[in-house]
Amino acid sequence: MAGPKLDGAGNAKLATLESALTQLQRVHGVVEQCAVAVKGQQPASTFVPQIRRATQPMVGLLKGQFGMISDQVASFLLAATRGGGNDHTRVRILREGVVQLRVQLELAVAKTHELHTIDDAHEGPAARGTSS
């Protein structure tokens, strides 16, 4: 059974959110690789450029339709690229940032479904197959 029908704006927003979730999975993978390296006493700084490259496109992708989430991604990027401090603390901050972004994106998907679902009652008699 197919999911609920969405209007055009809802489909566009969902496509944007799905793309952002896919990119976030890539960021999460890099963060977890960083965590494994830090656990093995290797520096986390070698993973910062990878995180930056994986995160920067998300800012532009989300800016048009989801500005507040885009600002959160930019904040995550700032926290990821900030120098100094303990590598274990950096990994913790990166993991928390990934979780926050995932929650916001999933909430945006749910809200998009809620706001852009097309009801059969609003489609008119021709769409339902009845005639007046």
What are these regions (language model features)?
Residues 12-19, 39-43, 59-64:
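A ubiquitous short alpha-helical element
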Residues 32, 39, 56-59, 63, ...:
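Alpha-helical repeat scaffolds in large eukaryotic proteins
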Residues 1-34, 85-132:
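Amphipathic, coiled-coil-like alpha-helical segments
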Residues 56-57, 74-82, 96-100:
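Hydrophobic alpha-helical segments of small multi-pass membrane proteins
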Residues 34-54:
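Alpha-helical segments in soluble extracytoplasmic regions
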